[in-house]
From Swiss-Prot:
Gene Ontology molecular function, alphabetical: RNA binding
Subunit structure, as described in the record: Homohexamer.
Protein name: RNA-binding protein Hfq
Disulphide bridges, residue numbers: none
RNA-binding keyword on record: yes
Superkingdom, natural source: Bacteria
Any Gene Ontology biological process: regulation of DNA-templated transcription
Ranges where the Sm domain occurs: 10-70
Family listed: Belongs to the Hfq family.
Organism (species): Clostridium novyi (strain NT)
Lineage of origin: Bacteria, Bacillati, Bacillota, Clostridia, Eubacteriales
């Protein structure tokens, strides 16, 4: 896999961000967060819930569940 190839994590989060798909994020301590993905990098996710922004460290994330399906398309062959 070369550097220009996106990984599934980036494809998933970017698709949720671009299409404004609401997500539920479960943290490793069991806490549940809901909102829209506003941005992300290698270590964090910015989540917006009714104007309240949260920065979540990815190492604290257990599961991310979208409210509607995330479609994966691979433009590379």
């Amino acid at each position: 896999m070369n550097k220009s190839t996106n990984n599934l994590q980036d494809l998933f989060l970017n698709n949720a961000r671009i299409n404004r798909i609401s997500v539920t994020i479960f943290l490793t301590n069991g806490y549940k967060l809901e909102g829209l993905v506003k941005g992300f990098d290698n270590f964090t996710i910015i989540l917006d819930n009714n104007g309240k922004q949260m920065m979540i460290y990815k190492h604290a994330v257990s599961t991310i569940i979208p409210k509607s399906p995330i479609l994966f398309t691979n433009k590379e062959k």
